[in-house]
Amino acid sequence: MSIRVLTGITTSGTPHLGNYVGAIRPAIRAAGAPGTESFYFLADLHSLIKVQDPERTQRSTLEIAATWLACGLDPEKVWLYRQSDVPEITELMWLLTCVAGKGILNRAHAYKAVVDKNRSHGDDDDAGITAGLFMYPVLMAADILLFNAHQVPVGRDQIQHIEMARDFAQRFNHIYGGEYLVLPEAAIDEQVATLPGLDGRKMSKSYGNTMPLFCTREELKKYVFSIVTDSRAPGEPKEAVGSAVFQLYQAFAGVEECSMFAQALVEGLGWGEAKVRLFERIDAEVAPLRERYEDFMRRPADIEAMLRDSAGRLRERDAIPLLARLREAVGLRSLSLCMVSAVPVPQEKVALPVLKQYREQDGRFYFKLIDGQGAVLVQSRGFASPRDAGQWIALFKQVVSAEALVSPMLEPVADPVVVLAALRRLREAGLDLYT
């Protein structure tokens, strides 16, 4: 069993160095970590909320896909797919829409921000607001829940969307009486790197101070030399801390190189020479990526084929089976199977198995699966925290094969067939699977 981690990739705009350092590079380094199954999707349906230029939408999707591939995302090791290639996402969105509370959507940060802006201008609350913007959190929830993601890396400003996804999943599970949807967790990286822009403020498209990731070598040099610095002349000591030039250098150089660069500034290195060193350091890392990016951009058909193939395999493995189960749960069933029920024959009640989570005297947390007569079917090994144990329980609930019962975190299972039957009974009963 592995932890599923899902990352959405915005497909609007041109990637800049801030995107690369703060999001792309760390995400790719984390991809394919042991015990992790990584999902990356191009959020082209989301982009339609803001962008209604079809040529721009198409071009941007290609550029973003080429960017991530050029930076090292390996589609042989992770899942990379386009949102619009998985129609089950929008079908799940509708099922979630039918259980989502409007009051929760009213409190969505993005929607509230536009409402507040309209009010400050004396306009109607919903002036210029589309249903797409209002329903954005439900689409995001469908992205996450369709593939039973356990963790979603987000910034603190996105935590609300994960909480909404959890709420919608809980409502659905409660209404239809089963553990159909896994409740995701927000994975917050407190060390997300932010780069200064050309003017010293945070690099952001809204400030117009970005440096495109894959501009030409000559253009990159012009951008670097346009970074704002103080007026201290060559020979005068300069402070590295707070300098945009030094902060950018830190993002691309090792600790020893940064220490030498900082010392050179203190000893009077001129800003012109400092920018030359910065440019050479950035270009050393970006140049090979730029070549790969240009190669991918010359082969859009290959990218299209890869995205479609990945989406097709994911649909077959995960999306289609889950939607079939959800359709059955909500009653979207074949009418040929609809029969008038006969008078039910009373049956002897058989106690259901149960999952128990508990803490031992060693301070560690455990769980076990017990049958209706109290016999232990599965015993876990110890976990450091209740959260770790809970995440494994969430994975264990979905086990459908004997191979998945072989894990270093589980004691050897004596009879996998009995265990799988017990889990299946619990799922069919639609009960909470642990106490």
Swiss-Prot record:
Binding positions (ATP): T10, T11, S12, G18, N19, G155, R156, D157, L195, K202, M203, S204, K205, S206
DNA-binding among keywords: no
Chain positions of motif 'KMSKS' region: 202-206
Compartment(s) where it occurs, according to its Swiss-Prot or TrEMBL record: Cytoplasm
Residues given in the record as L-tryptophan binding sites: D143
InterPro entries in UniProt: aa-tRNA-synth_Ic (IPR002305), Rossmann-like_a/b/a_fold (IPR014729), Trp-tRNA-ligase (IPR002306), Trp-tRNA-ligase_bac-type (IPR024109), Trp-tRNA_synthetase (IPR050203), YegP-like_sf (IPR036913)
Catalytic activity: tRNA(Trp) + L-tryptophan + ATP = L-tryptophyl-tRNA(Trp) + AMP + diphosphate + H(+)
Biological process (GO), any one: tryptophanyl-tRNA aminoacylation
Motif ('HIGH' region): 11-19
Gene Ontology cellular-component terms listed: cytosol
Keywords associated with the record: Aminoacyl-tRNA synthetase, ATP-binding, Cytoplasm, Ligase, Nucleotide-binding, Protein biosynthesis
Chief localisation class: cytoplasm
GO MF entries: ATP binding; tryptophan-tRNA ligase activity
UniProt EC number: 6.1.1.2
Keyword Hydrolase attributed: no
Origin superkingdom: Bacteria
Annotated family: Belongs to the class-I aminoacyl-tRNA synthetase family.
Free-text function comment from the UniProt entry: Catalyzes the attachment of tryptophan to tRNA(Trp).
Oligomer and partners: Homodimer.
Name recorded for this polypeptide: Tryptophan--tRNA ligase
Taxonomic source organism: Xylella fastidiosa (strain Temecula1 / ATCC 700964)
Lineage: Bacteria, Pseudomonadati, Pseudomonadota, Gammaproteobacteria, Lysobacterales
Gene: trpS
